[in-house]
Each structure stands twice: as C-alpha cells, then as structure tokens.
C-alpha cells in the first residue's frame, strides 16, 4: 500500500474492476493485492501483483510490514506499506476475463485508485483491511 506525507498522511487505495463491483463503493475498496504463487516470497508476490494490477513498478524504499488480516471470505491478506507518490491518472490496470451476459469479456483488475486520508481509506476499504491503516499510523508514529 503506497502512502505519502503531504499536509497530512495519505494512502493509495484501489477500487476493483469488473461488473460485480461497478455499483459498490464504500467498504469494497482494497489495497492492491493478489495471489502468492507456490514457492514465491510473499513480499515479492506483493510487488509483482502491484505491477500486474496497476502497471506501476512497485515503489522502492523501506517496506513496512503491516502483518495480516483475515477477510470474511476466509482469505488471509498480507500487507506492506511503502512511501511513494504515484499519479492516479497514470493507472493502466491489468485485465482479467470472465463470462458476463453469456460471453467472455475482459475487465480491468482495478478501475480506479485514489489518495485518501486514513479516515476516508477506512471508510472505503473492505472492513478487515482498515486494520492496515491503523497499523501504518502506529508504525509511522514510532
């Protein structure tokens, strides 16, 4: 999860693409994430997925380990934060395909990203992932 310090802390959150998410907003955004391949280091997977889903090379710098959270679906999400200043207008998301209305179609992995205050990010994020914001603020305060 990229973060930046402007007048105040901001974090970059992503809205999932595709028709299943088109009319869902608050509580449905996410950190950029994905699957860890067998034998892959989880941090390397996070960097790979970040690039696959946004087209941006994962930011360099010190990655803060934010631990893990468990989603209602039972999936475990591992989180890291790294300081970066990315322009949402430069988003060029990867695509996935699915059958929709009887035919296979392609949709963006992420349809938009936004810089948000921690409070706004917690409102937008999947509730379990809001914990990453709290952990980031604690890590930056230390």
Where are these regions (language model features)?
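The catalytic Nudix box helix
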Residues: 31-64, 117
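Charged phosphate-binding loop/patch that engages nucleotide di/tri-phosphates or the phosphate backbone
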Residues: 118-142
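Active-site-adjacent beta-strand/loop module that shapes the phosphate/pyrophosphate-binding cleft
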Residues: 68-103, 114, 136, 140
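N-terminal strand-loop-strand
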Residues: 1-31, 80
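Residues that flank catalytic or metal-binding motifs in active/ligand-binding sites
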Residues: 25-27, 76, 109
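Non-DNA-binding regulatory cores of transcription-related proteins
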Residues: 105-111
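Residues that scaffold the ATP/ADP-binding catalytic core of kinase and kinase-like folds
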Residues: 23, 39, 124
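Short, charged/polar surface micro-motifs in flexible loops or helix N-caps
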Residues: 6-8, 18-21, 37, 73-74, ...
